[in-house]
Amino acid sequence: MTKPTTEQPTIVKCPTCQSAVVWNAESPFRPFCSKKCQMIDFGEWADEEKSIPGAPDMSDSDGWSEDQY
């Protein structure tokens, strides 16, 4: 006989507003709490306010400058 599952749902914090978000299929914007928070985060990445640390792949001084052509 199997035991009934009494697992607590996984709760995460919204990366934008820090509110609690249940991590399941019924949370369509996870890890965000809403479409608004998802779009705020997307805008921060698009404006390069957020980035993944590391050396840049190329720069204008690497010979890819438009002035060259």
From Swiss-Prot:
Its cofactor is Zn(2+). Zn(2+) binds at residues 14, 17, 33, 37. It holds the Pfam family YacG. GO terms for biological process: regulation of DNA-templated transcription. The keyword Cell inner membrane does not apply. Gene3D superfamilies: Erythroid Transcription Factor GATA-1, subunit A. It comes from the Bacteria. Belongs to the DNA gyrase inhibitor YacG family. Interacts with GyrB. Inhibits all the catalytic activities of DNA gyrase by preventing its interaction with DNA. Acts by binding directly to the C-terminal domain of GyrB, which probably disrupts DNA binding by the gyrase. This is DNA gyrase inhibitor YacG. The gene is yacG.
